[in-house]
Amino acid sequence: MATTYRICPRSGLQFDTEAEKLMRWHAVAGVLSLLVGGIMALGVILTRWPAVKLLPADTFYMVLTAHGIDMLIFWIIFFEMAVLIFASSTLLHCRLATPKLAWLSSWLMVLGAIMTNVAIFQGESSVMFTSYVPMQAKPHFYLGLILFAVGALINCFIFLGTLVVAKAEKTYEGSIPLVTFGALTACIIAIFTIASGAIILIPTFFWSIGYIREIDSLMYRVVWWGLGHSSQQINVSAHVAIWYAIAAIVFGAKPMSEKVSRTAYFLYILFLQLASAHHILSDPGLSSEWKIVNTSYFMYFAVLASMIHGMTVPGAIEQAQRLKGYNKGLFEWLRKAPWGNPAFSSMFLSLIGFGFLGGISGVMMGAEQLNMLIHNTIYVPGHFHATVVIGTTLAFMGLTYFLVPVLFKRELMFPGYAKLFPYLFGLSMYMVALVMMGAGTLGVSRRHWDMAFAGSGMAYEWPGAAYLMMGLTGIFGVIAVVSGGLWILQIVFSILLGKKLEEGETRSTPIPLTLPAPTTGSHVHPPATPGTMVLALIFLTAFILYYFVNWKYLSSLWGLA
C-alpha cells in the first residue's frame, strides 16, 4: 500500500495517513480506559468517605483493582503510544515504520486490556494494582497484562524504527526536535519498564496455572516495582514533552537551552526509575547501603532533571511573551497569558501541581528516614494523584483539545466548558492530593476500605482532623470525577457530532522538515526571565520548609533521648 500524507490546514502538521489512524485508535482506546477507571474512582471515593462507605469490602477491592490498572496502566500507556507515533512520524515528516505490525501490536494491547478487565470484574482477581503474591489472580488477569505489555513493547520498537526511517530518508537535518527527544526518553524507559514486567509477570502467570510451585514474595516486590513505578516515569518524560509542545503551539516558545533540556532528559534515563526504591524501603531483603544510595544520591539527579524542566518551560513562555511586549513588572507575561485556552491552562496547572505537590512530596517520600512517616498510608496515593492525575492526565487532556480539530478534524463542541474544565478538574484534584497527604500524615491507611476498623477487636480512634480530611477527599473527589466525566462526554460528542473541518491537501511524498535557522549576531539576546526566577525561588522555599517540617515531625515521634 502506497504511503500518503495529509497536510493539516489548521496546524501545518503533516500526517502519514496510516499513522494518523493509529493515533486516533490509541487515543480512543485510552479515553475508554479512562472512562472505566473514572467510574471505578467514584466507587473508591464514596467508599473511603467515612460518612458514605458505599461498597462492601470485597466489591471495594475489585473496584480498586480496576481503578488502578485502568488508570495507571491502560489509559496512560494507550495515550503515550499515540504520543510516540505523533512525535516520530508527524514531527519528523516521515512515514511510519511497519504499519501492519503497528496495527497488530495495537490489537494486542486492546485484547490484553479487555482480558485483564474481564478477569477483574469476574470478581476473583481483586489483587489490586500491585498484585502482590501470594495473592493469586486468575490466569487471564496476568495473560492480559502480558499481551498488553508485548503490544506496547512492539510499538516502542516501531517508534525507534520510525526514527531510523526519518534519518535514512533525510526528512530532517541535525538533531531530532526536543519533543521527539522527550518521547525517545519515554520510549527507552518504557522498554526497561516492560522488560521488568515480563521478568516477573510471565513466571507469575505460570504460577497461577500451576506450572511453578511458588514465587518469592520479596523478589516479586523488588522486580514488580521496576514495572509499577517505572511506568510512571514514562509518564513524566511524556508529559514534560507535552509541556514543551504546548508552549510551542500556544506561544511559539523555544526552549531556553536545548542542551540543558536534553541533558535533563538524559538524567531521567539514568536515574529516574530508581525512585521505585521508595516503595520497598521497609522490605528486609535489601541492604541499608542500597536503600541509602538509591534514595539519596541517585534520586537527587532525577529531582534535578525535573526542576530543570520546571524552570525552562515557564522560562521559555516568559521569553516568548516578553518578545511580544509583555514586559511590565515581574508577571505581566503570566497575567496576559491565554488563560481561557484550555490547552495552556491545563498545561500550566499540570506543571505547578506536579512540581509543588507531586515533586516535593515525592522527594520527601523518597528519603529513607522520612518515608517511615507515611509508608503504606493514604499519603502515597495522594502523592501519585498529584503526579499522575495532575501532572500527566491533565497535560494529556489539555493536548486533546488541540488534537480534536487537528487529528480528528472536528470542531470542538461546548467551548465554554473547555475554558472551565482545567480549573474545575485541576483545582479539585489539587485538593484531593492535599487532603489525602494530610490524612496520610495522620496515619490513615492506604487501602483499608473502612478507616474506622468497625467491628475490629482492636479499634483505633482517629483524630477528628483525619475524618475531616477523608470527608474532603470524598467531596473534591466527586467533583473531579464528574468534571472528568463531562470532559469525556465533550470529547466524544465533538468527535462523533462536531462539525467536520477541512481535511487539507493529500500528498504521495512527504515535505521535508525545515527547522528555523539559528539567529546570528552578538546584538541579539533573549530577554531575561525574572518572573520565572521568582517562581523558582518560591518553589525552593516551599521545598525547604516542607522538608524541614517533616524532619521536625519525625524527631517528635522518634525521640533519641
Placement of each model-derived feature along the sequence:
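Membrane-embedded and interfacial regions of multi-pass energy-transducing membrane proteins
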Residues: A2-T514, T532
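Final/C-terminal transmembrane alpha-helix of multipass membrane proteins
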Residues: F348, L427, V534-N550
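Juxtamembrane boundary at the C-terminal end of a transmembrane helix
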Residues: Y546-A561
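Homeobox/homeodomain signature
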Residues: I374-N376, T519, I544
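Short, membrane-interfacial amphipathic segments enriched in basic
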Residues: R213, P518-H523
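Juxtamembrane cytosolic/matrix-side boundary and N-terminal portion
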Residues: G521-L540
